[in-house]
Amino acid sequence: MAYRDQPLGELALSIPRASALFRQYDMDYCCGGKQTLARAAARHDVDIDIIEAQLAQLAEQPIEKDWRAVPLADIIDHIVVRYHDRHREQLPELILQATKVERVHADKPNVPRGLTKYLTALHEELSSHMMKEEQILFPMIKQGMGRQATGPISVMESEHDEAGELVDVIKHVTQNVTPPPEACTTWKAMYNGINEMIDDLMEHISLENNVLFPRALAGE
């Protein structure tokens, strides 16, 4: 099957660094992972032949880890340590930086107004979300009760969509997380941190939406 006919989520899992390429083109491979490459390329006005050629080059590299073959309990442990714990570190620091930038540069036309508010909303949303996963959903899956977790998984997927919407707002108020020429060191560091957080969050959501949840629902 041609790459253009495959879902973004599958491509992100099967081709090394495909997720970074999709981020470069602002394609949503986590919450929007079911859309085909052709559909995503059309929505973002990307030449399908060019991105297919780029994916073909990436596909020649060995894949680091195929999460589709990893036991669910190991995936869950990885998600908690690699993503949940990291988000809990990232967001409070980004909120502090945003508060400072909005205060010190309030008179600048390019200041990301409202960024502190949106980062705080994302922090609150994810804190509640991750706690529910760790206390309710993940134990169910580890106990082999994935088939009975349809309701909790549906709620988690909906909350992933809500987090994705907040990320879109954050990208909007930060000019796609691009610092203006007058940005100070803190401003630039904050935008680097936001980009890292978005990368982590998209990988996190993709691993749950496209691997963990479908396999759990299938009764693994």
UniProtKB/Swiss-Prot annotation:
Record key words, sorted: Cytoplasm, Iron, Metal-binding, Stress response
Listed GO CC annotations: cytoplasm
Signal peptide coordinates: none
Taxonomic superkingdom: Bacteria
GO terms classed as biological process: protein repair; response to nitrosative stress; response to oxidative stress
Pfam assignment, any one: ScdA_N
One Gene Ontology term of the molecular function aspect: metal ion binding
Protein's cellular compartments: Cytoplasm
Regions annotated as coiled coil: none
Alphabetical list of InterPro entries matching this protein: FeS-repair_YftE, Hemerythrin-like, RIC_family
Function: Di-iron-containing protein involved in the repair of iron-sulfur clusters damaged by oxidative and nitrosative stress conditions.
Subunit structure: Homodimer.
Family: Belongs to the RIC family. YtfE subfamily.
The protein's name in its UniProt record: Iron-sulfur cluster repair protein YtfE
Protein's organism: Salmonella paratyphi B (strain ATCC BAA-1250 / SPB7)
Classification lineage: Bacteria, Pseudomonadati, Pseudomonadota, Gammaproteobacteria, Enterobacterales
Name of the gene this protein is made from: ytfE
